[in-house]
Design a protein with these regions (language model features):
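Alpha/beta catalytic cores of nucleotide-metabolism and tRNA/nucleoside-modifying enzymes
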Residues: 1-7, 12-151
Length: 151
């Protein structure tokens, strides 16, 4: 039987999705990219003239107190002050509707597929080519020496 492989964590850009799928992932978890959207749980607040939305990772103490402790093998712990956090709570920039983010992620994935000549996601896995670059090279490959005013 085939084991399903899910890339969980570290997905920040559409290229990360393409790399995970090319490496063999069947799915990706991209919860942090959706945090701050209208569809994500949490309240919207205004701080310093900007909008933010509360964020609570499933491994945070607050989430475990609300019932996620069993996911982290801590549900048998009766003294909730002894929970060990595997997530955080805080605020993220308010992003509006999730559709905008999904549109950009799909567009970026299509672009990555185009670079590899892959018409379908399964084609990404046929001949993936991974090139190791340094951290400096990574930052050099991003937009630099410019103040981005609009994406």
């Amino acid at each position: 039987s085939k084991t399903t492989l899910i890339a969980d964590g570290g997905i920040k850009f559409s290229g990360d999705i393409a790399k995970a799928l090319a490496a063999g992932a069947d799915a990706v978890m991209i919860g942090s990219l959706f945090a701050g959207t209208d569809q994500a749980p949490g309240r919207i607040i205004k701080r310093g003239g900007k909008l933010f939305k509360s964020f609570r990772g499933m491994g945070s103490i607050g989430a475990m107190n609300k019932g996620s402790a069993d996911r982290y093998f801590q549900s048998k712990q009766k003294d909730t002050s002894k929970y060990v956090a595997e997530g955080v709570e805080g605020f993220v920039k308010y992003k509006g509707t999730v559709e905008k983010i999904i549109y950009q992620l799909v567009g970026g994935l299509k672009s990555s597929m185009g670079y590899l000549g892959a018409k379908r996601i399964k084609d990404l896995r046929k001949k993936p080519k991974f090139v190791k670059i340094t951290k400096a090279g990574f930052y050099e490959s991003m937009v630099h020496n410019i103040d981005v005013i609009k994406k």
